Amino acid sequence: FITVRDFFKKKFSNLSQNIAHFGFSLLILSILFNNIFSSEIITNLKIGETFVSDKFKISFKDINQKDEQNYKAIIGKFEVIDSKGSNLIMSPELRIYNQPNIVTSEADIKTNLLTDKFMTMNFVQNQEYFNIRYQIKPFMVWIWISVILICFGGLISLFKKKYEN
């Protein structure tokens, strides 16, 4: 179809193609908007400190330790307040595995229909500070929805051809 009018005029004759092409255009727009509107803050904080920017405030509230079967978890508690006053508690963790001795960062991810918010933390060597990375990634869910639409259009086309034969 060339215009929106053609899309509605032809109705279901090319339904699979329309769904897949709509999914692809949604994918391109989602990636574009994600790239334009993403933001990231990388800073070093210790317990009790606060990082302030014009868009949000990140407060490092507390650290808890938790012993699991094959690793020890260090869980940070952060409060993120955006410019609108929305309050968000994030809890990224560091995992220290026993055999072999490996340290990994586990992100805390908060997702809604428009944005994903990620936070990770790492040790800063020989200091009481932790390296904090906070990212806001808009339209991540829409990237996945567009991929599902592309696959759905392909499946409809596949089964439609099978049914016609």
Regions found by a protein language model. Name each.
Residues 1-165:
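Solvent-exposed, non-transmembrane regions of integral membrane proteins
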